[in-house]
């Protein structure tokens, strides 16, 4: 990212200096019974992770007593690194992974205080430069390796907007060995700070990618997803797209009304199998 762009963000400062507790106010339902994964046998915590213009809050979970565990960079939804994303990290850690989830929007807003998803999207997400996001994710890889993660076994997994960012990161970061995108758009409007969509860069994909999508999700067009996959495959990369016909957007998010338990469990099993298939685990 150009130095002046980082400088501008640095002058603005980091709005979030620590992670939120509990679930996001913007999407959680009152009657939800979300999954809770305990931390027994794990090392978990918050860190201030070094990035190009300062430090970024992040959550991590890793198996205790394991030398050089494989690394999974977990990319949040638009709602921040709240309890659902933390729980995903713990689920991965129980499978033997060193999971790291950076709070990618800490420079722009305290997402724990925002309640309107549309406001989050327009006032935060669309104002976050992709170049900064990708730099932060690469710094998360650096941090995990410095903390003992296996430099030869690195993957990424993300949800919602983070699914879109999984595609971009897999097109950017040469150290990735596998990627898993839970929904997330691959096409849409662009801007000066978000100049390209995943579909535009699909031929540049650097690792095998699994895409998991809901057939009842009106926000993502299957034609776009399959077109992105076709471009990647034409360039010699491996992409597997799976649609769950009865699932909507956010079907894996157990704290949201969109949660579909059967499809969430099936998709999670497929995601873990994908990581193992490419020796990430």
Label the predicted regions.
Residues 68-77:
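Short beta-strand element of the alpha/beta-hydrolase
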Residues 236-281:
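C-terminal catalytic histidine-bearing segment of alpha/beta-hydrolase fold enzymes
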Residues 139-200:
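Primarily recognizes the serine-hydrolase "nucleophile elbow" in alpha/beta-hydrolase
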Residues 1-9:
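N-terminal secretory signal peptides
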Residues 115-155, 280:
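Gly/Ser-rich "nucleophile elbow"/oxyanion-hole loop immediately N-terminal to the catalytic nucleophile
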Residues 9-24:
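N-terminal export leaders
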Residues 205, 211-213:
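Short beta-strand/loop motif that positions the catalytic acidic residue
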Residues 33-64:
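N-terminal cap/lid segment of alpha/beta-hydrolase-fold proteins
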């Amino acid at each position: 990212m150009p130095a002046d762009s980082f400088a501008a963000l640095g002058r603005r400062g980091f709005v979030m200096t620590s992670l939120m507790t509990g679930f996001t106010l913007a999407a959680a339902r009152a009657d939800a019974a979300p999954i809770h994964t305990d931390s027994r046998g794990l090392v978990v915590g918050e860190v201030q992770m070094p990035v190009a213009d300062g430090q970024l809050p992040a959550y991590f979970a890793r198996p205790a007593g394991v030398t050089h565990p494989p690394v999974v960079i977990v990319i949040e939804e638009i709602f921040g690194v709240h309890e659902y994303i933390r729980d995903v990290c713990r689920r991965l850690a129980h499978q033997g992974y060193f999971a790291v989830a950076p709070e990618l929007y800490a420079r722009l807003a305290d997402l724990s205080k925002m309640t309107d998803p549309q406001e989050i999207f327009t006032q935060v997400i669309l104002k976050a430069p992709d170049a900064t996001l990708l730099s932060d994710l690469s710094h998360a890889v650096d941090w995990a390796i410095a903390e003992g993660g296996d430099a030869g076994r690195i993957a990424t997994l993300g949800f919602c907007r983070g699914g879109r960012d999984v595609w971009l990161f897999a097109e950017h970061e040469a150290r990735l060995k596998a990627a898993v995108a839970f929904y997330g758009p691959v096409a849409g409007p662009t801007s000066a700070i978000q100049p390209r969509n995943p579909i535009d860069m699909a031929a540049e994909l650097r690792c095998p990618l699994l895409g998991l999508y809901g057939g009842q999700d009106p926000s993502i067009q299957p034609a776009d997803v399959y077109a992105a996959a076709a471009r990647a495959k034409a360039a010699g990369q491996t992409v597997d797209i799976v649609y769950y016909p009865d699932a909507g957007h956010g079907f894996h998010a157990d704290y949201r009304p969109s949660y579909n338990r059967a499809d969430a469990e099936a998709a999670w099993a497929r995601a873990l199998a994908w990581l193992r298939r490419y020796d990430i685990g």
